[in-house]
Amino acid sequence: MASTVSPNRMTLLALKRRYTISKRGLKLLKDKLEAMVKAFRDLYTEFDRERRYIEELMEAFVELLNQYESETSPAVRDRIRSMQLFQVEYELSTRMVFNIKVPFLDVSLKRMDIPDLYLQTGPAFYKALSVYEELLPHLLKLASLRNALHMMSVEIEKTRRRSNALEYNVVPELERTIKWVQQYLDEMERSQTVRIMKVKSMLEKERGNA
């Protein structure tokens, strides 16, 4: 940058203003990055808690399904597969995660009333349905949280790149250029002072010889 600027007072003032703005921007970016990383960790904690809970539900669901299959005939299972067991409603909402708008898909399940189904299946089937009613919303929430983590990681990386560009490129280059312009102006001032002193000395000699 030093070779592309005019070394004068106006340039020096402009460079110093830009340097001040860059330093302030760097601090803001670092503060933002720190807060985003904390928000990411909090979100990951929520994601991990949700994942563990889903694992417990899945384990119970699989166990109940195995029990259900041992209690019912293949013909009944085939009939159940063709049935609509739930009325499903979806709702798309958004959640602000550190100024990032993250979509969340919510689901509500309403079990269909099939009176003779219990007689053909048994308690394990209905317990499995209850677990499934709880499981599906949590699965969708887990997917939404995973998407939120991805979106935040992208934003964190963008902010980190901007912060690094300022810290390791822009700010050091401005410091070097300011130093170069300041040294140039100081040298010019010293040279001018020397010339003035020489002229003054010559004038004094001329007056002394007159």
UniProtKB/Swiss-Prot annotation:
Keywords, ordered alphabetically: ATP synthesis, Hydrogen ion transport, Ion transport, Transport
GO biological process, one term: proton motive force-driven plasma membrane ATP synthesis
Function: Produces ATP from ADP in the presence of a proton gradient across the membrane.
Name used for this protein in its record: V-type ATP synthase subunit D
One family name in Pfam for this protein: ATP-synt_D
PANTHER family according to UniProt: V-TYPE ATP SYNTHASE SUBUNIT D
Coiled-coil blocks: none
Database matches in InterPro entries: V_ATPase_D
A GO molecular-function annotation: ATP binding
Family the entry assigns: Belongs to the V-ATPase D subunit family.
